[in-house]
Amino acid sequence: MKKAFITGVNGQDGSYLAEYLISLGYEVHGMVRRNSMSENQDARVIHLSDKLVTHYGDLLDSSSLNKILENVMPDEIYNIAGQSHVRVSFDIPEFTVKTNSLGVLNILESYRRICPNAKFYQASSSEMFGNSVDSDGFQRESTPMHPVSPYGCSKLFAYSIVRNYRNAYNLHASNGILFNHESPRRGSNFVTNKVVKTAVQIKLGLTDKLELGNMDSYRDWGHSKDYVRAMHLILQQDLPNDFVVSTRETHSVREMTEYVFQKLNMDYNYYVTQNPIFIRPEELKYLKGDSSKIRKLGWEPKYTFESMLDEMIEHWISYYKK
């Protein structure tokens, strides 16, 4: 039985990845950070409690990483932990860089010394591209990277150090350059779930307005369930590599908001206002990924933009009607 170790296992991607690997017959171990509200931490993985082995640890605590890897000796490592909110990275840049950059270096060092024959996946991000776009309107593996946020900068260091360790130490270490991906498990401070959750609240009379930032930024949105399948596929290859994971479609925040409100038979114009607090100091205007490289391995998304949002709408309606 293969053993997998997932950092950030109680996050959106980590929880879906754990489910997927368990369904494939893996022995799955996950790392969680101890905090004062453990019940909130475990909400996404509580249903896996009899199948998932959790370990307390932190990417900034090398001793915890060493101890976990020595105990587990995994075949596959998925590093999905980190500070994942782009707007928040402007408020806490030091923590963002420590966690997303130094934290990756820490786990790479532990991996290199303790279980170098394992395969390693790093969660990279389309935010690394910044506003760089190829002439055909896509970002791909070869597109120059010029991030426009502390988050994007932190992920670019992590991406680069993974490539460096791969070449310097002959490690099977790969990057998945994931474009935006959502689900009902997405944090409510991210724009997609914020829009869906608040729209449902408005429909049910629980609130009367939705405040957003830049509604004319475009993103390539997919579903987390599809993207964790891509993570696993990347580590099944004989040689390590870097892959863009995306839907190859782009939609604006305005389009997304309009779709959600229309599904609930409402006109968003009556409820949505712009609040400058949600606008980034430097905006990333447009993302659209060319995922041709990983599609040649047989991956493709099962969810459409619309079916993803429909699932999120249904989730929040059910949540508030309980």
Say what each PLM segment does.
Residues N40, R185, I313-E314:
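Short Asp/Glu-rich motifs
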